[in-house]
Structures are given as structure tokens and as C-alpha cells.
């Protein structure tokens, strides 16, 4: 289940795919959108993705998978490593990352305002490097982050 909402976990990957589908109908990009968290959140490995899907889908999922490990340092250090990884990602992977940010931000701001302060600061920094992602989704994500900062008490 999803943290905060108790919804079935699959709802988040489906929502990310639906957001991506507003800007592309490329089946490999949509498959990668569904799979974007599979390596981080399940026992699946990138090798499993390579075996079960096309090389392009596997490459996109690899681009979307955080590279940091707990031993790399504190959260700020780890998120910076992941941000640098995202900066090198393909435009398609960055588009999926933007959709993920859009999907997650709504839930976190609503259900965990204390953590949202940290999370939205991280996402603001991430948006600075997701410049190759689809401009429509980049604007939506930027609007969410801006709205958060403009509406804080």
C-alpha cells in the first residue's frame, strides 16, 4: 500500500504512466513509467527488467532508479548524487521523473507537511536539472513547487 493514503501501491505507477501519457503515446516510455520504481521498491533488479522488457525500457528504468546507497552519506548527499544521475538521464526518462514528482508532491504536501518542507526543497533542486523533460510536465511540476512556496503560512 501507499504511504500516507493506504491506497494500493499500483495506483502510483499507474498515475505516473497516465501523466506521461498526456504528452506521449510511446509504448516503451509508458512501460518505463509503470516500472519507474520497480527496482527501488520491489525485489526486482535492473537485470529482471532487461530480461522481461526491451533494452530501451530497461535503460529508461535504469535512468529512473536512484543510484545512491545509505552508505553514501546523509540524505542531502544521497539526494545530490541522485540529482546528478537524473541530470544525465534521457529526455524521456526526465519526462517520467517529472510525472513522478507531480504525482508524489500532491500526496506528500497534503499528508506530511513537516516532511514536505524537505521534500519540496529537494524537488525544487531536481527541477533545475530536468530541463530536457517534456516542457508541459516541467511547467506543471514547477507550478506545484511554486504554489507550495507561495501558499505556505
Per-segment meaning from a language model:
Residues 1-153:
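Active-site helical microenvironments for divalent-metal-assisted chemistry
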